[in-house]
Amino acid sequence: MKPENKLPVLDLISAEMKTVVNTLQPDLPSWPATGTIAEQRQYYTLERRFWNAGAPEMATRAYMVPTKYGQVETRLFCPQPDSPATLFYLHGGGFILGNLDTHDRIMRLLASYSQCTVIGINYTLSPEARFPQAIEEIVAACCYFHQQAEDYQINMSRIGFAGDSAGAMLALASALWLRDKQIDCGKIAGVLLWYGLYGLRDSVTRRLLGGVWDGLTQQDLQMYEEAYLSNDADRESPYYCLFNNDLTREVPPCFIAGAEFDPLLDDSRLLYQTLAAHQQPCEFKLYPGTLHAFLHYSRMMKTADEALRDGAQFFTAQL
């Protein structure tokens, strides 16, 4: 779409979202738009430090988990000794950015609000890792903790997956992978999905929205996809285009959160409408005035905190 035809998003977002957009970090260098992926990853980690400050303190442990691809870092957040369930968190970042530090506050708040153990999985980023490596690493970590639950003193009888953006796709894809391959890692009580992409190649919101403010232009989305997938055929895989999977049966209860001015919003709407049409347990909530990635900004945005509380409440209601 011709850029002039897109919605004037920055004029339409909420007051608290505008405050976030206008928040300057004077010690931060400019975004290395023409830099290497390594430079962009470093910048992303630095930029997120401010937004991760002030998170709840709790017992935190780090473990390296073996997979067929090598060791994968995990981080456990334990808000109480006797957790009712374990939530696996997959960070966003377009498959190419992000780590356990960039999403630390999100995971801590989710653990605090749910009172469940949260395990962040630092899956290998793309393009170093190609589809389906990240999913297989997540599944391997889930199996590992299920087998070692007593040693790590965690409750793996009931589990869940949660993620934002690309992490939301990985969360649902991992749950479907376990279902389809009949892998027992405990009962999947729920899946929490914040503004994910699930397989649409075009949509109204992808046309009307997306720009330099969110890194989600059509060109950006194509770049993330090309970095993540191994070949063109992967675009139709039921673990990438999740609408090609069977969404009519045995889908764990899904909390689907949408951001009003997110180009990926139609992915969330379609996922909800598909699941609801086939009587699969699901809930959709739209957060007005928000941009993609708003979950990071709970230091300033009540809406971000609300979205995390909503997800935690949905999950605990399934237990």
Swiss-Prot record:
Key word Cytoplasm present: yes
PROSITE patterns: LIPASE_GDXG_HIS (PS01173), LIPASE_GDXG_SER (PS01174)
Short sequence motif named Involved in the stabilization of the negatively charged intermediate by the formation of the oxyanion hole, residue ranges: 91-93
Protein name: Acetyl esterase
EC category name: hydrolase
Family: Belongs to the 'GDXG' lipolytic enzyme family.
The protein's Enzyme Commission number: 3.1.1.-
Active site: 165, 262, 292
Main location: cytoplasm
Subunit structure: Homodimer. Interacts with MalT and MelA.
InterPro entries named in the record: AB_hydrolase_3, AB_hydrolase_fold, Acetyl_esterase, GDXG_lipolytic_enzyme, Lipase_GDXG_HIS_AS, Lipase_GDXG_put_SER_AS
Entry's Gene Ontology molecular function annotations: carboxylic ester hydrolase activity
Keywords, sorted A to Z: Cytoplasm, Hydrolase, Serine esterase
Entry keyword annotation includes Hydrolase: yes
GO CC annotation, single: cytoplasm
